[in-house]
Curated annotation (Swiss-Prot):
Glycans are attached at N38, N147, N229, N266, N307. GO terms for biological process: endoplasmic reticulum to Golgi vesicle-mediated transport; GPI anchor biosynthetic process. Residues 30-451 are lumenal. This is Protein TED1. It is a multi-pass membrane protein. One of its GO terms (cellular component) is endoplasmic reticulum membrane. Keywords: Endoplasmic reticulum, Glycoprotein, Membrane, Transmembrane, Transmembrane helix. It is found in: Endoplasmic reticulum membrane. Its main location: endoplasmic reticulum. Residues 1-8, 473 are cytoplasmic.
Amino acid sequence: MLRCAVKKFAYFATFLTIVANIYIYTYPSFHPEQCSWNCSNKNAPLQKDLTFVDKVKNYFSDVREQWHGSHASAGNDEDIHILAFGDPQIKGIWPKTPYVSRLDTYGNDYYLGHIYDMMQQRLKPQVVTVMGDLFSSQWIGDSEFHNRTKRYISRIFKRDPTSIENIKQQNLDEKGQYKANWPEWGDRFNEILDNVKENEADNQELSFGFGYENIHSWNPDLEDFLIINITGNHDVGYSGDATYQHMTRFHDLFGKDNYWIEYETNTTHPWRIVVLNDLLLEGPALQPEFVEATWIFLNQLNERKFNGSTVLLTHVPFYKREGLCVDGPDTRYYPDAHAPESYKSGLLRSQNHLSESVSNQVLNMIFENGKPGIILTGHDHEGCETVYNKKSTSTWEATKNIESDVFVKEITVKSMMGEFNGNTGLVTGHFNTDSMTWEWTFSLCPFAIQHVWWFAKVSLLVTIFTWSSLLFV
């Protein structure tokens, strides 16, 4: 009797396990339009217009294409393919963290890693970018920052952590843990900053080394794509919080926070990636020299008079009126009696958007040539799509639709966290040989709430255990 009941349960558990695991390993095929690179076939019927039978056929057809790797080669070979992930915000584990929370944090790393694995294997992007807020808090010690970086690199993005381990060995404290050498980094930073300011009139770029050209991978021996990590407020803080310690450890473990990479500059279709730490554009700032350095970066970028298209990657969205996105404009400052950090009184504490004046300045400097481009941001976990239309007064107005001959799209990439359904942003850049301009399209590929991933994994363990138990009943 017991054996019969266990066997029935084993069959039921097996069925659920198969269904759940098929879903988590083929979920992009349930949204083939959203989870594939944009291609030139504009006549294909939309998924929402198909019958149920046609949707099922599309699903199996897409699974077959994924199995054979057809999605990675979809479209024109000259197209640009970028995967964008919003605000993973991975949490930490502390000595008093309950075991259930430890397990949840451990599983969350692999939930996020599953999303990346599926999309990377399916689409083989040229660029992968994470839109800031890599971690859940900037108020963590250096050793914890290193620990989370190692988890982030190895568990989520399956990269070799050897380089950050080497950095740790070069910067050990008395307990053998990583400690950011911010006095040395700060001295070097200020030496460079002073040098740039002295030679500003001569436009010499001997210092921060903001510019690169035709970089397709930071480590070509290990990776055939470029990965870019943007600074978020939970990584380095807003300008009223950002310290030398914050900036040193980010530079140590992730690299520069401001730079550009130019591609195809001697062709008819040049384009570039601009990485901007827009957390350090406004103040009042705790370290005003950080803001000064960011504006030096923008001035040097503007002086290049680049004539191609721009992909701008940054964290905080540009100014827009209330109602266009979930997050409206909201800027806050530390009060005068902010204990125990009275030295922060009046400094910038948080902002949902850049201010209107700074937004106009930055957009005019980066998109001065009037060429089509695209902006990718994070910060607003719900995501948003807007268009910035340039007016005759050199101001930019955010709307939902194109209202000007000169415009740029801003995509706030919806968070990849489980509570927001584990999203991936897909950007396709296609050069139109008729208009001789780049065209940029975006789609959002959702996965599912993290409990679905957990169910698939737990159900597999339950199924194995149940079938094994039949040996003893």
